[in-house]
From Swiss-Prot:
Family: Belongs to the cation transport ATPase (P-type) (TC 3.A.3) family. Type IIB subfamily.
GO terms assigned for molecular function: ATP binding; ATP hydrolysis activity; calmodulin binding; metal ion binding; P-type calcium transporter activity; PDZ domain binding
Coiled coil, from the record: none
Acidic residues composition bias: residue spans: 1087-1098
UniProt membrane topology term: Multi-pass membrane protein
Active site: 482 (4-aspartylphosphate intermediate)
Biological process terms in GO annotation: regulation of cytosolic calcium ion concentration
Species of provenance: Oreochromis mossambicus (Mozambique tilapia)
Keyword annotations: ATP-binding, Calcium, Calcium transport, Calmodulin-binding, Cell membrane, Ion transport, Magnesium, Membrane, Metal-binding, Nucleotide-binding, Phosphoprotein, Translocase, Transmembrane, Transmembrane helix, Transport
Reaction(s) this enzyme catalyzes, per UniProt: Ca(2+)(in) + ATP + H2O = Ca(2+)(out) + ADP + phosphate + H(+)
Name of the featured protein: Plasma membrane calcium-transporting ATPase 2
Extracellular side: 116-152, 394-426, 879-888, 953-970, 1034-1043
Main location: membrane
Length: 1112
C-alpha cells in the first residue's frame, strides 16, 4: 500500500511537471536526481546541464543575491510544483488502539479470565437434585432464596470494573499523547532559518522554506532542506547522519557544492539555493520509504515477525528538519543498517516513548527517580505476588482439609462444579490481593506529574525535550554554566580601546586617533566579520539599536559606528563573493581571519580574536602615527600587564584586531595556517562589556541555598571570568575557591602521559568555581569527571548549559543538558534535554523548582499508595485466611485501586511548586525514595487503619448490633457488616489523601489546598461516587445501603486519620532508626546490567563525537 501511495504521488507530480514545464526551467524529478550526485560528478552535471549554479538559479527564477521576490502567487506555485518543506507525521494512535494497549496489562488479563470462569460456572447447574445436600458444607446455602441465580453478578461486576479501569487508562494515554503532540509542534515552531527574500535577510519558519529560496548557512546550523552552494567560506559539514561518514566534508562551489537536509554545519558559513524540500529532499526520501514501510512492518509484527531494528518512523521530520528524527546509518557487520533516531520529546505517548528509548542513540542511564521507582515497584510486585500466592494456597488447603479430611467427605463428580466455583472464588481473592499490591499507578503518577510540569515549565521559559530531565533537575547538585548570554545579557558594547600606544577608558573622538590606524581598524572590523552580522535601528524611538548575528561582532560594529564611520559601504565595495579566503572562528583557532585581494594584485589579511592569542602571533604593532613598529616579547608582557589585565579585571572581554600584507608573487599557500596566521601587525585592542543580567545574582544565591554548586565554564580570559563570577556571586572575595584556566586545569588532571586521571580530577572539582579559557573538550572532561567521581557519599547530578556546536558531547554527557534557545546552535539544541527559550540562568532555577516538585509529588503519591497497599493486602490476606473470604470484595478492591491509582495520582501529582522547595538540599542519588518520615507515616497510618478494620471485622456486628458477614456461604446477599468495613476503609483513604499532601513532617496538611482545584474536585468527586456505590451499588458492589448513623460513624472513623496524623507527626524520627528505607539506590546496584552497558556505550559515543569535534 505504501508503494502504491508513493507511485500515485510521483505520477501526480509528473502530471504537474508536464503542466508547469514552462513555469520553471527544471522539473521536480530533475532536481531530485541532481541532488543524488556528489563531488566532481555533481559539479560537471551542474555545469553541463544547467550552466553552473547561476544557471540553476535562473531556471528556478531566483536571484543568488536577492532571493525570491516573495510574491504570494509565486510562492503558492512553488509549493504546488516542488512541495512544502514538511513530512506528514505518523498518524496518532486511535482511542481503540489505546484501549487495546491498556487491555494488555497482565493483572487485568488474569482478572478477566477469572471473571469469565466465574460467569461460566454460575450458569452451570449440576444434574440431579441431591447435589447440594451431598456436597455438604461446601454447598451450604448455595441455593438460599434463589441466590444462585445472582451468581453471575460478581463475574459481570469484575468485567465491568476492568472496562472502567481500561477506559480511564486509555483516556489518560490519549490526553498524554495529545499533549506530547502539542509539545512537538511547539519545538517545531521554534525552528527558524535565515533566508534572503526580496533582498532582505529574514528568519523564516523551516516549514515555509521553498525551492528557489536563498538560505544563509552558518556554523552550528542544521540544514532544513537540500541545496546547492552558491558561495561558501571554509565550509565543513558533518554528513554522518545521512552517509555514516564520520569525517567532516569540505564544501565549496567548485569542488563539492551539494548540501543535504539534516546535516550539520560544523564550520564556516555560506549561501545556498534550495533545490529540494520535504519528502523530496534526500532525508525526506528516506523518511517516505520508511513511512511506507511502517504499515508492512506492523502487519509483520502482528504475525510475530517483528522487524529486527525497529525502523518505524516514530517521530516526524516535520518542516523537513532533522531535529525530530535523525537517520543514522551504522555499519553493522559490513552492511549498512538504517536506524531511526527520534531526537525530540516523545511524540506519541508512552508506547512511542518506549520505542524512542529503544531506537535512539544510547541515552544516559535511567533518571534517578525512574531507577528508584523501578526498584521499588519490583520489590512491591514480588511481595504482592508472594502474598497472593500464599492467600490462594491457604484458602485451597483450608477448604480441602475442612471438607475432605475433617469431615471425611468423598469427592463426588456431581459436586465438581461447586468445588470449582469455590476455587475460582479463591483465585479471584488472590488476584484481587495482587491487583491491590502491584503499584501500576506509579508510572501513571510519574507521567501525569511530568506532563503537568512540562506544560507549566513552558511558561517559565523551559522547553523540555526529554521528559525525565525535568525530574532529574530536582536532584541536581552542580550546574556548569556558560558565561555569555546565560549569566550576562549577551548585549556587547565596546567601552574601552587601546590604539596607537594609548589606552582610552572611553571610546575616543575619531579625530584624536591616527588616520591610518582608524582606516585599518574600520576596514578590518567591517570586512572580517560575518556579513550576516548587522546593527539595525531600534524598533521604537529612544530604544537600543538591534543587534543581529554574532554579538561580539555586533559590539565591534558598534565601535565602528561610534567612531562616526559606517561598515555597510565597505561591505558593498567588497561583497562576500570577493573575499579571497576566510578562516572562520572555531574553538581551536579562537580567531577569525579574512583575506582580500588588493587592487595592485597583492593580498591583505585581517584578523581578530582573543587578545592574548592574537597578540602572540603579532610581530609588529601600529604606533602613535599609525606606522608599524617592532613588537618584542618584552612589549607583549608589558601590554598584558598594563592593558589586557586591567580591562579583564573590569569584567571586559578583550579582542585584538590585526592585519598582515602578502605579496602575490609567489602566492602564499593558504592551507599552511601556521605560517599564514603569524607575523601579524596589531592595530588595536578593544574592551567589550557584556553586563551581568540583573536577576542572576539572586538566582545563584537561591541555587547555593538549595545545595547546588554553580560553576562558570567559559572561553573568556581568566580575569574577565573572575570579575564576572564575583559580580554574579559565584565566588566571594576571600573564599578558598579555585579559578583556573584550561591550561592549568589540564596540567592538574593529566598524568605524565597526558591521560586524564579520576583521582586528579577529584582533587580539583570540589573547589573549582571558574574554569576560564576552556575548550569544549575541557568542558566535557570536567562534566564527566564530576559525574564519575565516587569521592562523595552521593554521586553528583550535573546540569550543563551550552550553545555551541562543540558543546554537544558535554550536553549529552551531563545528567541534564540545557541549550540556549536564542543563541544556541541547532546542534546544541539537538544534544540537549531542555531548551532555555530566554537563555536566562534564572530559568534554570525554575527548572530545579519544578524538578523537586515532581519528586515530591511522586513521594506524596507513594506515601498514600503504600499505606493503602499495606492495609488492603493485610486485610484481604488475614481476612481470607481466618474467615475464608476477603472482607473487601474483588469489585470493591478494583474501585479502591481506581481511587488509589488514577485519581490519587492525578490529585497528588498536580500540586504547584513553592519557593520553600529551594530551601533544602537535593535528595541525591542514593537517598532512599521513601524517607524515614514517609516510612513513619505509612506504618503509622497503616496501624490505625488495620486496628479499625479488624475491630469492625471481628466485633463490628456487636458494636452496631447487626448480622455478622463472616463465614457467609457462596453467593449470599451483601451484608451490612462488610459494607461498613468497605465504607470505613474508603473514608480513611480519602482523609489520608489530605495527610499525604505533606511528606516532610509538616503539621498543617491543609496549607495551600485550595491552590490545587484538581485535588479538591477529586476528593469531593470520590466522596460522591462512594455514596452512590454504597447506597445503590447493591449486589455488583456487594453493598447494603447504610442509614445516616452508620454513615456518620464511617466518616468519623475516616476523620480520625487527620487527628492520628498529628499524633504521628509528634513522634521523633530518631526513635525509628530501625525502619528499613525502601527504594534505595546504592552505588553498586544502581542499574541493571544492560543499562550499565548502555551507559558505557554512551560514554564511547560522546567521546567519539568529541574526537570528531577536535579539529574545531
Amino acid at each position: 500500500m505504501g508503494d502504491m501511495s508513493n507511485s500515485d504521488f510521483y505520477a501526480k507530480n509528473q502530471r504537474n511537471e508536464g503542466n508547469h514545464a514552462a513555469a520553471f526551467g527544471c522539473s521536480l524529478m530533475e532536481l531530485r536526481s541532481l541532488m543524488e550526485l556528489r563531488g566532481t560528478e555533481a559539479v560537471v552535471k551542474l555545469q553541463e546541464d544547467y550552466g553552473g549554479v547561476e544557471g540553476l538559479c535562473k531556471r528556478l527564477k531566483t536571484s543568488p543575491t536577492e532571493g525570491l521576490a516573495g510574491a504570494q502567487t509565486d510562492l503558492d506555485k512553488r509549493k504546488e510544483i516542488f512541495g512544502k518543506n514538511l513530512i506528514p507525521p505518523k498518524k496518532p494512535k486511535t482511542f481503540l488502539q489505546l484501549v487495546w494497549e491498556a487491555l494488555q496489562d497482565v493483572t487485568l488479563i488474569i482478572l478477566e479470565i477469572a471473571a469469565l470462569i466465574s460467569l461460566g460456572l454460575s450458569f452451570y447447574h449440576p444434574p440431579g437434585e441431591t447435589g447440594g445436600e451431598s456436597c455438604g458444607a461446601a454447598a451450604g446455602g448455595v441455593e438460599d432464596e434463589g441466590e444462585a441465580d445472582a451468581g453471575w453478578i460478581e463475574g459481570a461486576a469484575i468485567l465491568l470494573s476492568v472496562v472502567c479501569v481500561v477506559l480511564v487508562t486509555a483516556f489518560n494515554d490519549w490526553s498524554k499523547e495529545k499533549q506530547f503532540r502539542g509539545l512537538q509542534s511547539r519545538i517545531e515552531q521554534e525552528q527558524k532559518f535565515q533566508v534572503v527574500r526580496g533582498s532582505q535577510v529574514i528568519q523564516l519558519p523551516v516549514a515555509d522554506i521553498l525551492v528557489g529560496d536563498i538560505a544563509q548557512i552558518k556554523y552550528g546550523d542544521l540544514l532544513p532542506s537540500d541545496g546547492v552552494l552558491i558561495q561558501g567560506n571554509d565550509l565543513k559539514i558533518d554528513e554522518s547522519s545521512l552517509t555514516g561518514e564520520s569525517d567532516h566534508v569540505k564544501k565549496s562551489a567548485d569542488k563539492d557544492p551539494m548540501l543535504l537536509s539534516g546535516t550539520h554545519v560544523m564550520e564556516g558559513s555560506g549561501r545556498m539555493v534550495v533545490t529540494a524540500v520535504g519528502v523530496n529532499s534526500q532525508t525526506g526520501i528516506i523518511f517516505t520509504l520508511l513511512g511506507a514501510g511502517v504499515e508492512e512492518e506492523e502487519k509483520k509484527e502482528k504475525k510475530g515477525g517483528a522487524v529486527e531494528d525497529g525502523h518505524q518512523n516514530t517521530g516526524k521530520m516535520q518542516d523537513g528538519n532533522m531535529e525530530s528524527n535523525q537517520i543514522k546509518v551504522k555499519k553493522q557487520d559490513g552492511a549498512a543498517a538504517m536506524e531511526m533516531q527520534p531526537l525530540k520529546s516523545a511524540e506519541g505517548g508512552e508506547a512511542d516513548e518506549k520505542e524512542r528509548k529503544k531506537v535512539s542513540a544510547p541515552k544516559k542511564e535511567k533518571s534517578v527517580l525512574q531507577g528508584k521507582l523501578t526498584k521499588l515497584a519490583v520489590q512491591i510486585g514480588k511481595a504482592g505476588l508472594l502474598m497472593s500466592a500464599i492467600t490462594v494456597i491457604i484458602l485451597v488447603l483450608y477448604f480441602a482439609i475442612d471438607n475432605f479430611v475433617m469431615q471425611k467427605r468423598p469427592w463426588m463428580p456431581e459436586c465438581t462444579p461447586i468445588y470449582i466455583q469455590y476455587f475460582v472464588k479463591f483465585f479471584i481473592i488472590g488476584v484481587t490481593v495482587l491487583v491491590v499490591a502491584v503499584p501500576e499507578g506509579l508510572p501513571l503518577a510519574v507521567t501525569i506529574s511530568l506532563a503537568y510540569s512540562v506544560k507549566k515549565m513552558m511558561k517559565d521559559n523551559n522547553l523540555v525535550r526529554h521528559l525525565d530531565a525535568c525530574e532529574t533537575m530536582g536532584n541536581a547538585t552542580a550546574i556548569c554554566s556558560d558565561k555569555t548570554g546565560t549569566l550576562t545579557t549577551n548585549r556587547m558594547t565596546a567601552v574601552q580601546l587601546y590604539v596607537g600606544d594609548v589606552r582610552y577608558k572611553e571610546i575616543p573622538d575619531p579625530g584624536v586617533l591616527p588616520p591610518k590606524s582608524l582606516d585599518l581598524l574600520v576596514n578590518a572590523i567591517s570586512i572580517n566579520s560575518a556579513y550576516t552580522t548587522k546593527i539595525l535601528p531600534p524598533d521604537k524611538e529612544g530604544g537600543l539599536p538591534k543587534q543581529v548575528g554574532n554579538k561580539t561582532e555586533c559590539g565591534l560594529l558598534g565601535l565602528v559606528l561610534e567612531l562616526k564611520r559606517d561598515y555597510q559601504p565597505i561591505r558593498n565595495q567588497i561583497p562576500e563573493e570577493k573575499l579571497y579566503k576566510v578562516y572562520t572562528f572555531n574553538s581551536v583557532r579562537k580567531s577569525m581571519s579574512t583575506v582580500i585581494k588588493l587592487p595592485d594584485g597583492s593580498f591583505r589579511m585581517y584578523s581578530k580574536g582573543a587578545s592574548e592569542i592574537v597578540l602572540k602571533k603579532c610581530s609588529h604593532i601600529l604606533n602613535e602615527v599609525g606606522e608599524p613598529r617592532v613588537f618584542r616579547p618584552r612589549d607583549k608582557d608589558e601590554m598584558v600587564k598594563k592593558v589586557i589585565e586591567p580591562m579583564a579585571c573590569d569584567g571586559l572581554r578583550t579582542i585584538c584586531v590585526a592585519y598582515r600584507d602578502f605579496s602575490s608573487n609567489p602566492e602564499p599557500n593558504w592551507d599552511d595556517e601556521n605560517n599564514i596566521l603569524n607575523d601579524l601587525t596589531a592595530i588595536c585592542v578593544v574592551g567589550i562589556e557584556d553586563p551581568v543580567r540583573p536577576e542572576v545574582p539572586n538566582a545563584i544565591q537561591k541555587c547555593q541555598r538549595a545545595g547546588i554548586t554553580v560553576r562558570m565554564v567559559t572561553g573568556a580570559n581568566i580575569n574577565t571570568a573572575r570579575a564576572i563570577a564575583i559580580k554574579c556571586g559565584i565566588i566571594h572575595p576571600g573564599e578558598d575557591f579555585l579559578c583556573i584556566d584550561g591550561k592549568e586545569f589540564n596540567r592538574r588532571i593529566r598524568n605524565e602521559k597526558g591521560e586524564v586521571e579520576q583521582e586528579r580530577i577529584d582533587k580539583v572539582w570540589p573547589k573549582l568555581r571558574v574554569l576560564a579559557r576552556s575548550s569544549p573538550t575541557d568542558k566535557h572532561t570536567l562534566v564527566k569527571g564530576i559525574i564519575d567521581s565516587t569521592m562523595a557519599d552521593q554521586r553528583q547530578v550535573v546540569a550543563v548549559t551550552g550553545d555551541g556546536t562543540n558543546d554537544g558531547p558535554a550536553l549529552k554527557k551531563a545528567d541534564v543538558g540545557f541549550a540556549m534557545g536564542i543563541a544556541g546552535t541547532d546542534v546544541a539544541k539537538e544534544a540537549s534535554d531542555i531548551i532555555l527559550t530566554d537563555d536566562n540562568f534564572s530559568s534554570i532555577v525554575k527548572a530545579v523548582m519544578w524538578g523537586r516538585n515532581v519528586y515530591d509529588s511522586i513521594s506524596k503519591f507513594l506515601q498514600f499508595q503504600l499505606t493503602v497497599n499495606v492495609v488492603a493486602v493485610i486485610v484481604a490476606f488475614t481476612g481470607a485466611c481466618i474467615t475464608q473470604d476477603s472482607p473487601l470484595k474483588a469489585v470493591q478492591m478494583l474501585w479502591v485501586n481506581l481511587i488509589m491509582d488514577t485519581f490519587a495520582s492525578l490529585a497528588l501529582a498536580t500540586e504547584p511548586p513553592t519557593e520553600s522547595l529551594l530551601k533544602r538540599k537535593p535528595y541525591g542519588r542514593n537517598k532512599p525514595l521513601i524517607s524515614s518520615t514517609m516510612t513513619k507515616n505509612i506504618l503509622g497510618h497503616g496501624v490505625y487503619q488495620l486496628i479499625i478494620i479488624f475491630t469492625l471485622l471481628f466485633v463490628g456486628e456487636q458494636i452496631f448490633d447487626i448480622d455478622s458477614g463472616r463465614n457467609a456461604p457462596l453467593h449470599s446477599p451483601p451484608s451490612e457488616h462488610y459494607t461498613i468495613i468497605f465504607n470505613t476503609f474508603v473514608m480513611m483513604q480519602l482523609f489520608n489523601e489530605i495527610n499525604a499532601r505533606k511528606i516532610h513532617g509538616e503539621r498543617n496538611v491543609f496549607d495551600g489546598i485550595f491552590r490545587n482545584p484538581i485535588f479538591c474536585s477529586i476528593v469531593f468527586g470520590t466522596f460522591a461516587v462512594q455514596i452512590v456505590i454504597v447506597q445503590f451499588g447493591g449486589k455488583p458492589f456487594s453493598c447494603q445501603p447504610l442509614d445516616l448513623e452508620k454513615w456518620m460513624w464511617c466518616v468519623f472513623l475516616g476523620l480520625g486519620e487527620l487527628v492520628w496524623g498529628q499524633v504521628i507527626a509528634t513522634i521523633p524520627n530518631s526513635r525509628l532508626r530501625f525502619l528499613r528505607r525502601a527504594g534505595q539506590l546504592t552505588q553498586k546496584d544502581e542499574l541493571p546490567e544492560e543499562d550499565v552497558n548502555e551507559e558505557n556505550e554512551e560514554i564511547d559515543h560522546a567521546e567519539r563525537e568529541l574526537r570528531r569535534g577536535q579539529i574545531l
